[in-house]
């Protein structure tokens, strides 16, 4: 399993903190996340380069 990510973890994009993610599942060599479009819609994204994902994503959701 990949260290540093867990199911239902809340993340945000470091370049744009308002872009929010929730970890859907952690696979052997990938992290699958929901990228939230608004409060109800999301898009599923899969990061296979986990070290790169750790550089892009920060812990938690910013206060609005």
Swiss-Prot record:
Q: Which domain of life is it from?
A: Bacteria
The name on file for this protein is: SPbeta prophage-derived uncharacterized protein YosJ
Annotated organism of origin: Bacillus subtilis (strain 168)
